[in-house]
Regions:
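Nucleotidyltransferase catalytic core that binds NTPs
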Residues: 2-249, 257-258, 281, 288, ...
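Ordered hydrophobic segments in well-structured contexts
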Residues: 38, 272-274
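A short, glycine/Asx- and small/polar-enriched loop/turn
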Residues: 266-271
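Short beta-strand elements
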Residues: 274-279, 288-291
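Asp/Glu-rich intrinsically disordered low-complexity tracts
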Residues: 299-324, 329
Length: 338
């Protein structure tokens, strides 16, 4: 492979770390010029098994260089949120990327992306950006889409991988790419969970020991809801609420059933059940796929034979994952922590 001489040094089969956007653009442009595909995994660092799964999925693509960005984006944190406290573990994260065989890490500082005077132009996420997470965190999705758009413009990847745990984020990023005619395929990857079903999140580190034990109730409630899909939307919500009602110490911010595009849920077909809750001072979100109405009936007509069937976009050819009857999210074909 011949890289132009004015391009920053890039060594194959090693982790190459770049801070400046201009350096990353030159390197990825040169790689594309010699026929390589680029896959981007955007992160805020504090890498865990969920991030590792995104990277593994990206690495399965043939003829592809995997780039991982690590940037705690101030634009997506509101007043009183945990921007200052958000875990920053860059040295550990870079060691993790090296172990996984990642070849390009982009680790900008805030000034590198937004300049000395800050960013003047941001993206409007539209009406969906004010619902669900957007209602609880005003401005969050505008800040998120702005940094993702910048990363896509800097790296210009053929693919970008996002976890389904942040499902509303995934939907909005896909919509942005479509609306703005960006030439990147957005790939959603199923949530990685602990053995008790809790979705992996960097914010899990904030949980007290007692709250950590309670937190698994969120995934249990989602699973109970998904299993009621054959009986319709009301039954899904009632089943989930019944499970949560036994745990009044968990403060529910929202529990909603939506379509896969986060519009209204269909009477029959694929939907998404989403939850946000506080345990102590820690805020957690989660979601699960749901099949509603006749779509939830197995080929033999039994209730819930496919409850929680995965419908994620998979560039690696693995296809969807189907859940067994009675499955909780930890059993629904999701990736397990490794």
């Amino acid at each position: 492979m011949s890289i132009p001489t004015n391009t920053p040094k890039f060594t194959r089969n090693e982790l190459n770390v770049f801070r400046l956007p201009s350096d990353v653009s030159k390197v990825t442009g040169a790689l594309r010029g010699v026929g390589r595909n680029i896959a981007l995994v955007p992160t805020m660092g504090a890498l865990h098994a969920g991030h590792k799964e995104l990277i593994r999925r990206a690495k399965r693509l043939p003829n592809t260089i995997v780039a991982v960005s690590i940037f705690v984006n101030p634009l997506q944190f509101g007043e009183g949120e945990d921007f200052e406290a958000y875990p920053r573990t860059l040295d550990h994260d870079l060691a993790t990327l090296q172990e996984l065989g990642v070849e390009l890490a982009f680790t900008p500082e805030t000034v590198d992306l937004y300049g000395e005077s800050g960013v003047a132009v941001t993206l409007d996420p539209g009406p969906l950006g004010a619902e669900l997470e957007g209602e609880m965190r005003p401005g969050h999705f505008g800040g998120m889409l702005t940094v993702v758009a910048k990363l896509l413009n800097i790296v210009r990847p053929h693919y970008a991988f996002f976890g389904e745990k942040d499902y509303q984020q995934l939907v909005l990023v896909k919509r942005m790419v479509e609306d703005l005619n960006m030439d990147t395929r957005i790939i959603g990857v199923p949530t990685v969970r602990c053995d008790d079903g809790l979705a992996l999140s960097s914010r899990n580190a904030y949980l007290s020991e007692e709250d950590r034990e309670r937190a698994a109730v969120l995934s249990t409630a989602l699973g109970m809801g998904a299993n009621a899909g054959a009986h319709g939307a009301d039954a899904v919500l009632e089943a989930a609420r019944a499970e949560l009602a036994a745990h009044p110490e968990i403060k529910i911010e929202y529990l909603e059933l939506r379509g896969t595009d986060l519009g209204p849920a269909p009477v029959d077909g694929e939907a998404r059940l989403l939850i946000a809750a506080r345990l102590g001072s820690t805020r957690l979100i989660d979601n699960t796929p749901v099949l509603l109405g006749a779509s939830a009936l197995g080929s033999d007509g039994d209730d819930g034979g496919d409850a929680g069937h995965e419908t994620h976009d998979d560039a690696t050819g693995d296809g969807p994952h189907a859940a067994p009857a009675g499955a909780t999210p930890s059993q629904q074909g999701y990736q397990r922590e490794s």
